[in-house]
Curated annotation (Swiss-Prot):
Function: IF-3 binds to the 30S ribosomal subunit and shifts the equilibrium between 70S ribosomes and their 50S and 30S subunits in favor of the free subunits, thus enhancing the availability of 30S subunits on which protein synthesis initiation begins.
Region (Disordered): 1-20
Subunit structure, interactors included: Monomer.
SS bond list: none
GO biological process: ribosome disassembly
Key word Ligase present: no
PANTHER family per UniProt: TRANSLATION INITIATION FACTOR IF-3, TRANSLATION INITIATION FACTOR IF-3, MITOCHONDRIAL
Family: Belongs to the IF-3 family.
GO cellular component: cytosol; membrane
Keywords: Cytoplasm, Initiation factor, Protein biosynthesis
Name assigned to this protein: Translation initiation factor IF-3
Highest taxon in the source lineage: Bacteria
Primary location: cytoplasm
């Protein structure tokens, strides 16, 4: 027989969704209890459980790594709901910046270069970083100045204050690249 539950527990711990200990699952003998009105006191676990039971709420261990562990007397279902709502709001407000790559060769035609330039501008307007890469093959490596010229031309055409050069043009093996990023709106 295969034990399938071990994998599920491992996946849950990896996702960062740690379960808080509540009521009888709290293992400490003594806890610091924060009441609804904000007052604190250090109580034996039995007294803290009794206070929670009298208020018809749950005793939730919110900070287990301190001595004594910090517990709150709250409605656990309501607490989980608000935690989920807060995390959803944080994910919604988070902006993911992607790195887009535009590749070309040193012997690129002007029309093709114009097309690549429009792609670069489009990526920057979307808020993404752009890595402009020029690949050299064979004897083209003897003419790296052509690559620098192309990259300089792109930077001159962009020349807008809304974009910054994050990484200047440099050679790495047979490729030359630079990274352009949009300025952050603060």
């Amino acid at each position: 027989m295969i034990n399938r539950s071990a994998g599920k527990d491992r996946d849950r711990s990896r996702s960062g969704d740690k379960e808080l200990r509540i009521n009888h699952k709290i293992k400490a003998r003594e806890v610091r209890v924060i009441f609804d009105d904000g007052t604190q006191s250090v109580l034996p676990i039995e007294d803290a459980m009794r206070c929670a039971r009298d208020a018809e709420l749950d005793l939730v261990e919110v900070s287990p790594n301190v001595l004594p562990p910090v517990c709150k007397i709250i409605d656990y279902g309501k607490y989980k709901f608000h935690q989920g709502k807060r995390q959803k709001e944080q994910r919604k407000n988070q902006k993911i910046i992607k790195l887009k790559e535009v590749r070309m060769q040193p012997k690129i035609d002007t029309h093709d270069l114009d097309f690549k330039y429009r792609n670069i501008l489009g990526f920057l307007k979307e808020g993404n970083k752009v890595k402009v890469t020029i690949r050299f093959r064979g004897r083209e490596l003897a003419h790296t100045h052509l690559g620098y010229g192309i990259l300089e031309g792109i930077l001159e055409r962009i020349g807008d204050a809304n974009y910054i050069l994050e990484s200047p043009a440099k050679m790495e093996g047979k490729t030359m690249f630079l990274v352009i990023a949009p300025k952050s709106k603060k």
